[in-house]
Curated annotation (Swiss-Prot):
Chain coiled-coil ranges: none
Gene Ontology molecular functions: chorismate synthase activity; FMN binding
Origin species: Streptococcus sanguinis (strain SK36)
Protein name: Chorismate synthase
Subunit (UniProt): Homotetramer.
Annotated pathway: Metabolic intermediate biosynthesis; chorismate biosynthesis; chorismate from D-erythrose 4-phosphate and phosphoenolpyruvate: step 7/7
Residues reported to bind NADP(+): 39, 45
Catalytic reaction(s) noted: 5-O-(1-carboxyvinyl)-3-phosphoshikimate = chorismate + phosphate
Domain of life: Bacteria
Length: 388
């Protein structure tokens, strides 16, 4: 399975094309729209979420609610484009109109300046439009298709926030993936500890009042993963490496860890390695899950536990200093719409990206022209592993 996304933040629409999805997978626009709605939620979201109400249109690859095995095309209209038709016109316009909403003052922390240098733009809006987090709309749409596929083979994906700015959420131990999903869904800030809800919301309110932004750490957990996805035979076949690349590709993500993660650098080997157990009922299992579900770049049957760190949103209502690319004079950076935090939405994006990487790996390992063929292959593999 592979996919491409296209579209600009203020363009007419966003598009994704997905190739390699098995025939016979039940898929509806309503299912995808429910995931898109999750991305637009969360405490602290700003004006654009009131403007946009994302609705997907499926224009190929699905007939009568079932995938057909061909490329699936997904489109989401940008309702905000109505105000930007001349500014974002694909056709040539006169010089006066070209100058409308021109950006020459790059914002620190964004792709504006480096994009202008790389692609030789004199209007940094060209960098802003494609590098915008608006693109993650289609990552979530693609991820919805991936999650729909994973559901069919008993794989469940959930995400929640474990650190909000400088505040660590005290996460209860031994929550199942289903419990994490349920608790996070009930929280406006996507946390699984309701005792911290009001504290976090008050913190976000204060950050907004200060004209600042915060980042944090998001954890995605995946249960029911078949053993042996990924491989140790080449560096680029290791599944944890593929997931790491996917997570860090999300706007504003700066780091990733699995299981105990960077804490492993402070612990002894005897405290980190997961002891192997066996029972007639369950086959091989692990006593702990410090390695986050991976050994040798392969899934080991334990839940996948991956965390990504998101930097604060770089657009500030108290803008930092920058330099105009035309005059080279210092200036306060251009202010675009911004939120004090996008952590809950970013959690949905991360969850979607991880699901997409996993679905791609599942389809690479197992026969999958048709959904029933895939389900049969996965079931036979699970039985073999259990009896190993």
């Amino acid at each position: 399975m592979r996919y491409l996304t296209a579209g600009e933040s203020h363009g007419p629409r966003l598009t994704a094309i997905i190739e390699g999805v098995p025939a016979g997978l039940p898929l509806t626009a309503d299912y995808i729209n429910a995931e898109l709605k999750r991305r637009q939620g969360g405490y602290g979201r700003g004006a654009r979420m009131k403007i946009e109400s994302d609705q997907v249109e499926i224009t190929s690859g699905v007939r009568h609610g079932l995938t057909m095995g061909g490329p699936i095309t997904l489109n989401v209209t940008n309702l905000d484009h109505q105000k930007w038709q001349e500014i974002m016109s694909a056709a040539d316009v006169d010089e006066k109109k070209k100058g409308l909403r021109k950006i020459t003052k790059p914002r620190p922390g964004h792709a504006d300046l480096v994009g202008g240098m790389k692609y030789r733009f004199d209007d940094l809006r060209n960098s802003l439009e494609r590098s915008s987090a608006r693109e993650t709309t289609m990552r979530v749409a693609v991820g919805a298709v991936a999650k729909r596929l994973l559901e069919e083979i008993g794989v469940e994906v959930a995400s929640h926030i474990v650190t909000f700015g400088g505040i660590d959420i005290n996460v209860p131990n031994n929550l199942t993936v289903g419990e994490i999903k349920e608790r996070a869904a009930q929280s406006e800030v996507s946390i699984v500890n309701p005792d911290r809800e009001e504290e976090i919301k008050a913190y976000i309110d204060q950050i907004k009042k200060d004209g600042d932004t915060i980042g944090g750490v998001i954890e995605t957990v995946v249960g029911g993963v078949p053993v042996g996805l990924g491989s140790y035979v080449q560096w680029d076949k290791k599944l944890d490496a593929k997931i790491a690349q996917g997570v860090v590709s999300i706007n504003a993500f700066k780091g990733v860890e699995f299981g105990v993660g960077f804490e492993a650098g402070r612990l002894k080997g005897s405290q980190v390695m997961d002891e192997i157990l066996w029972s007639e009922e369950d086959g091989f299992t692990r006593r702990t899950n410090n390695l986050g579900g991976f050994e040798g770049g392969m899934t080991n049957g334990q839940p996948i536990v991956v965390r990504g760190v998101m930097k604060p949103i770089p657009t500030l209502y108290k803008p930092l200093m920058s330099v105009d690319i035309e005059t080279h004079e210092p200036y306060k950076a251009t202010v675009e719409r911004s939120d004090p935090t996008a952590l809950p939405a970013a959690g949905v994006v991360m969850e979607s990206v991880v699901a997409t990487v996993l679905a791609t790996e599942v389809l690479e390992k197992f026969s999958s022209d048709n959904l029933e063929e895939l389900k049969d292959a996965v079931a036979r593999h699970r039985e073999f592993v259990k009896n190993f």
